[in-house]
Amino acid sequence: MNPVPAQREYFLDSIRAWLMLLGIPFHISLIYSSHTWHVNSTEPSLWLTLFNDFIHSFRMQVFFVISGYFSYMLFLRYPLKKWWKVRVERVGIPMLTAIPLLTLPQFIMLQYVKGKTKSWPGLSLYDKYNTLAWELISHLWFLLVLVVMTTLCVWIFKRIRNNLENSDKTNKKFSMVKLSVIFLCLGIGYAVIRRTIFIVYPPILSNGMFNFIVMQTLFYLPFFILGALAFIFPHLKALFTTPSRGCTLAAALAFVAYLLNQRYGSGDAWMYETESVITMVLGLWMVNVVFSFGHRLLNFQSARVTYFVNASLFIYLVHHPLTLFFGAYITPHITSNWLGFLCGLIFVVGIAIILYEIHLRIPLLKFLFSGKPVVKRENDKAPAR
């Protein structure tokens, strides 16, 4: 069994926070991109589309690697049932809190913005359910996926731990070439599964809950397990924290392939299957790029960094409705895309930080948006003198 490191690995905390906060420029740039979203500017920006595609191509793959790393660390710290309970509470409670407080008002706002309030009563019961599944889960999808992954890893992590007890982990050797082949095969396997579903019963792919619980989990689970293995095997972790020109070049070429597929691919053909193969290996290579960069520049303790590490989840949760509000009611009054993008960042981040500070002063909200029970210090219980 692995001992839990005594020293906090600050660069992983920082990377996870930055990846979370990157969701803000990602969604604001989506307004000004050529991609169709809930709200869009009159004229798309080529550079903001490119910026949006870059973030989208790797962000969540790297995020789930870090999530798997810390999840296995806690797996060794707690008994199995407590581990599952703690992990599910920390992601499930914020998700369930955000649905009535954030995504439901967001959905109602969009119904009015897009003029769909009159057509809602005419939808079938299934269409209403499916629309609500997509719109209420919305940007919270990764929290739902983490709940599913945590439940699956009750069995997976037990198998990994049992196998480690019966083998010598020091003899395990990893190479980026071997990992690249494995993830290429995983990407092809995912593409085959998706294409098979598309042939057999295509409507299921547009089902929101099936997409989140099955397809997203299936795609990101290898990255989650890779993170756990990086915690177990120092050699594997060193492989990611050591800069590699090969990984950087491969990631750049994969991103070009991703852009070409976005530009020339067709959803009725093989666009989504091709994208899954590209982003599977691109995500792996970007783990090296991001980890090595973060290990070199972010591996330190700072009060300012700690603040945003703690605030990142809350800011991410509230940024989405704020972004859509900005896109619906403010974007039409700003003619410049870049000026609108910068104003959007200031608007969303500024209000999100204010809301974060307010929620810190309300114990119930602090618990609901973090999933962590409020622990009173002994000093707080002592009578004043």
UniProtKB/Swiss-Prot annotation:
Record keyword Manganese present: no
InterPro entries associated with the record: Acyl_transf_3_dom, Glucan_succinyl_AcylTrfase, Glucans_biosynth_C
GO cellular component term of the entry, any: plasma membrane
GO BP of this protein: glucan biosynthetic process
Entry keywords, A to Z: Acyltransferase, Cell membrane, Membrane, Transferase, Transmembrane, Transmembrane helix
Cited Pfam families: Acyl_transf_3
Family membership noted in the UniProt record: Belongs to the acyltransferase 3 family. OpgC subfamily.
Task performed by this protein: Necessary for the succinyl substitution of periplasmic glucans. Could catalyze the transfer of succinyl residues from the cytoplasmic side of the membrane to the nascent glucan backbones on the periplasmic side of the membrane.
Full protein name: Glucans biosynthesis protein C
Organism: Shigella dysenteriae serotype 1 (strain Sd197)
Gene name tied to this protein: mdoC
